[in-house]
Amino acid sequence: MAEDSESAASQQSLELDDQDTCGIDGDNEEETEHAKGSPGGDLGAKKKKKKQKRKKEKPNSGGTKSDSASDSQEIKIQQSSKHNAIWQQISAGAAMGGDTMEGEWIDLRMYHKNPTIPIQKLQDIQRAMELLSACQGPARNIDEATKRRYQFWDTQPVPKLNEVITSHGAIEPDKDNIRQEPYSLPQGFMWDTLDLSNAEVLKELYTLLNENYVEDDDNMFRFDYSPEFLLWALRPPGWLLQWHCGVRVSSNKKLVGFISAIPANIRIYDSVKRMVEINFLCVHKKLRSKRVAPVLIREITRRVNLEGIFQAVYTAGVVLPKPVATCRYWHRSLNPRKLVEVKFSHLSRNMTLQRTMKLYRLPDVTKTSGLRPMEPKDIKAVRELINIYLKQFHLAPVMDDAEVAHWFLPREHIIDTFVVENPSGKLTDFLSFYTLPSTVMHHPAHKSLKAAYSFYNIHTETPLLDLMNDALIIAKLKGFDVFNALDLMENKTFLEKLKFGIGDGNLQYYLYNWRCPGTDSEKVGLVLQ
C-alpha cells in the first residue's frame, strides 16, 4: 500500500485538486460517492441519461433473452454509474490534474499560430485546461481512463492501465522498515482510533456516514448503514481496533473522516494471501478540499503494513490503474409501486402500474424442499460448501469456521442465510443476502428504501434459478423493496430469467501490490459489503 517515506509525488497529491468531492485514490476526493454504489444499488440517474444508455447498451447475460426478461424491461430502473462497494469499495476517483497531455498539445498549437503569446500565459491556459478536465468527473471506462494522469496511483504498487500482465505475484516485496509515526494531517485536524464498542463513538460514525457517504447523482437517495450493520461489517474475526481510523477537528473533536480495513484470506488464481479489504472511506462534505482523503489512505496503509500485511482488495465504480475484473449491478423490483413513487424507477410507455405490479408478482411460498434459516449447527457444513464451490473462481475468499459464523449466521436487519437440508440431513445448498436500506430524501411519505444485496449463493443439488427465486420470495415477504445482484459467479444464468434489470454502471475490482492477469466477471467469487 502507500509508501512509507513521504515522496515528493505523494506529498504533491495532498496539495492539488480542490474539488468539493471525496475519494480514496488520492487523485480526486470525489469517489467516496462513487465507489460503493448508489443507494439501493445504482439508483437515481436522470431519465434522459438512462434512455440514452439503453439505446446503445445491450444486456450481456450469456444467453438469449426470455420473454419474461424482455417484459421485465417495461419498468425502467433509474440508475447512476456509482457502485457498491470503497477501496467497497478503495473508493477511487478521477485522475488528479486531469489530462495534462491534452493541455500540452493545445499550448503547442497556439504557440505555432502565435509565437508572441507569453509563455506564462500559455502555462496559465494549460493549468486552466487541466482543472477543466479534472472537473469533468472520474473515468467510467478504460478509454476515458487512459487519457488521464493518476499522480497518486502512479506512485503506488499497482499495474499501469496499459500494462499487459501474464505473471502472478507481489509487485513490491514485503517491507521490514515501516514508518512508526502517523502521517501528518492538515492543520486543525487530529487522528483518532475509533472504539466502536463505545455506543457514542458508534453513533458518531453512523452520523458521519449517514450525512456524508454515498448518494445518487440527484441527491434523492443515500445509503443508511445502521449501527448494527457497521459492527457486523467492521468487526469480523481478526479485526483490529487501529484499523478503524478516524479524523477529528482538533478544536471541538467533531468526527469528520474515516477509513477502515478488515482482514481476509483471499485466493487469487492459485495463490492464497492474507490481505485486507478497505472500506468506508468518508470525509465530511465541507472538508473535501482539505485533502484529508489521501492522508487517510496512506495512514491506513501504514497501519496495515505494521501488522505484516502488504496486499489489499477494494472495489470502485470508476476506472483506476488497473482493474482485475469488472462487474455490473442488476436490480429486481419487489415493490414496484413504492419504487415508482420515490422515483427509483419509472413506468415505460404503454405500461400501467397495475400491469407492472402483475409483472413482478411473486408466489407467497418458497419452492425448495428443506429450505430453512441457517443455525449454528450448520457452520461446518456451510464452510465446506462455500470453500469447495468457490474454488472454481479466480478471485474468492477462503473462510474458516469463525468467519462463516460471523458472515452468515442470520442477524435481523443485517444478514439472512437459508440452507437446504435434504431428507438424510445433509446440507446441499444455501442462499444469503444482506440488508442495506437507503434514506429517501425530499419525499413526503416514504423515508426509507429497503434493499437486499445478493451475498453468496451455493448450489450442488438445487438449481440456482430455483434457489434465487426463493431468495426473491423471502426478501419480498420480509418487506424488501428491491433485490440487487452483481453479474459475478454464476449469477448471469438467472438474472434475466428472474426479471432483473441491468444497471448502467460498472463495479471494478482492484488488488493492491499484486499483479495478475485480468478475469471475467463470472470468474469473480468475492462480494464486498
From Swiss-Prot:
Residues 46-57 have a biased composition (Basic residues). It is found in: Cytoplasm; Membrane. It is an enzyme of class 2 (transferase). It catalyses: N-terminal glycyl-[protein] + tetradecanoyl-CoA = N-tetradecanoylglycyl-[protein] + CoA + H(+); N-terminal glycyl-L-lysyl-[protein] + tetradecanoyl-CoA = N-terminal glycyl-(N(6)-tetradecanoyl)-L-lysyl-[protein] + CoA + H(+). Pfam families: NMT, NMT_C. Tetradecanoyl-CoA binds at W153, L281, V283, S289, R291, V292, A293. One of its GO terms (molecular function) is glycylpeptide N-tetradecanoyltransferase activity. The modification Phosphoserine is found at S38. Its EC number is 2.3.1.97. Adds a myristoyl group to the N-terminal glycine residue of certain cellular and viral proteins. Also able to mediate N-terminal lysine myristoylation of proteins: catalyzes myristoylation of ARF6 on both 'Gly-2' and 'Lys-3'. Lysine myristoylation is required to maintain ARF6 on membranes during the GTPase cycle. This is Glycylpeptide N-tetradecanoyltransferase 2. It comes from Mus musculus. The lineage of its organism: Eukaryota, Metazoa, Chordata, Craniata, Vertebrata.
